[in-house]
Amino acid sequence: HAGVTLLTLRETCGDRLPCGTIIDTPRFGYRGQHLDCARHFFGIDFILRLLDLMALLKLNRFHWHFADDEAFRLEVDTHPLLWQRTAFRGEGELVPGVFGGGIRAGGSYSKADVARVVAHAKALQIEVLPEIEVPAHSHAMIKAVPGLRDPGDNGEEASVQGYIDNIVNPAVPATWDLLVPLAKEVAGLFPIGILHLGADEAPHGAWGGSPAVAALKAREGLQTSDDVQGWMLAKLAGALGAAGVRVAAWEEASKGVQGGIGNAALLFSWTGQGPGVEAARRGHDVVMCPAQNAYFDLAHSPDPDDWGAAWAGFVPLEKTVAWDPVPQGAEDIAPRISGVEACFWGEFTTEDGQAEGMIAPRILGIATKGWEPAGRTDGAALRSLASVYGPLYDRIGWRRYRGA
């Protein structure tokens, strides 16, 4: 980090640096960038370049999202059908392309790939956080491994993305036969000692038509779908905890009877900061990643020529610093805020360069929120700072957004 500071000073001041003493320390211990490699397959070279970019901005956590409805891309030994059947999408594949795309595309990550990413990250003082997605966002998993749903379930609950079969059933034995060995194997590949379980966006009314879940509810005293998900996550967290692995999850994991997944879990607050504040007050450590400020799949502006989504608004550069990870009035939970994260989701990505321009220069704003004291850099100052970093992006060959 000291070397990066000197590097950026050289960009600002040239080869002659002013004399002085630098006293600098990060505000938060967790400063992350997430990458969705399930919807769009990013090759290892891209990931290594992203790690280089993160290091230039003193980010220290890479959140690797390689499993979702569309694919499971990690080459695991416990259940090889997961990646063998879903790593590629398109005509003739088990999982078709989105929006009618028929051209075969995709890929998977070998254990050698994982080791390469972990080693490169370690050299840059970055840890890699892996994520599997359960119980929802599991369409690919369900397609690849039969038996993860109750055959007597007559429900057709749909996910936000339109899938009617994307949630595994915690009341059937096959689910546990798959999940516990899978989770332990994945966690064992990454030195961080934490496994992100997903747990977001369970379809409304999930498992409502499942006789097996009805019996589970009666046996365990559960009432709602949130109760069932929470029970499932707590059970999986217990199995991982016994193996020395801490769990993380999206904010929804704390819903349900007895607090869902349990207070030891690290939660990621993505729909806004409110759920994160509530979770922190219940005893969770929280990473703030509100979509309105930190989701880089959202367009930079309303300009119709700007690529990106708009479901949570638009995120111009200035908006990435127009918030505080510890909201005003919630200073009591400051010790529970572990840090911040920017997220890039790949539903609409067709080529890597799109992601580059969505991530940079906005990644600088989230890095700033994670490092600096509250309120130091506003939008105007950030835009000025971004111009300093431009040549550094160019030097590592990272394309950046050049619009307004």
Task: Place the predicted regions along the sequence by residue.
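Flexible loop/turn segments at secondary-structure boundaries
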Residues: 41-43, 69-75, 135-141, 196, ...
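Acidic, contiguous N-terminal accessory segments
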Residues: 1-31, 241, 246-254, 261, ...
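Flexible, acidic glycine-rich loops studded with aromatic residues
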Residues: 247-255, 259-265, 269-404
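Feature activates predominantly on carbohydrate-active enzymes
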Residues: 1-176, 184-194, 235, 239, ...
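Glycine-centered loop/turn motif at secondary-structure junctions
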Residues: 58, 123-125, 244, 283, ...
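Generic recognition of stable, solvent-exposed alpha-helical segments in well-folded globular domains
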Residues: 46-49, 109-116, 174-182, 227-235, ...
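Active-site neighborhood of glycoside hydrolase catalytic domains
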Residues: 141-151, 156-265, 270-283
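Hydrophobic alpha-helix position signal
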Residues: 54, 121, 217, 240, ...
